[in-house]
């Protein structure tokens, strides 16, 4: 997908919450925008549709969690299933990104900004990091 101005929504998938970020390939930047509730990994698909339409997204990016040794876990399979359902429901290209350590990095950045109050949920910040990783890969293509 090089040489295109793409608007992407990035997702940090979880069984209870799904973080969402938006970014684009013009500046290769991303912003955390939402945390969606999920029930056993099933989101409110209408809210996702609304986000896609609001931001005019033309590509979706899903973080895929692996164990530190690269092995897969139960959540790995659930995140892939979520990515497939996104593609089937909305007909947009879906990219998957290795999301190891994004939550730890999100916490580090939170405190680095001088924010001392412990964040309740960092899912949308993790989605931002996932999307920034994908945007950097697009820049390097």
From Swiss-Prot:
GO terms for cellular component: cytoplasm. Coiled coil: none annotated. Transmembrane segments: none annotated. The keyword Nuclease applies. Keywords: Cytoplasm, Hydrolase, Nuclease, Ribosome biogenesis. It is an enzyme of class 3 (hydrolase). One of its GO terms (biological process) is rRNA 5'-end processing. It comes from the Bacteria. GO terms for molecular function: nuclease activity. Its main location: cytoplasm. Its EC number is 3.1.-.-. InterPro entries: RNaseH-like_sf, YqgF, YqgF/RNaseH-like_dom, YqgF/RNaseH-like_dom_sf. It is found in: Cytoplasm. Belongs to the YqgF nuclease family. Could be a nuclease involved in processing of the 5'-end of pre-16S rRNA. This is Putative pre-16S rRNA nuclease. It comes from Coxiella burnetii (strain RSA 493 / Nine Mile phase I).
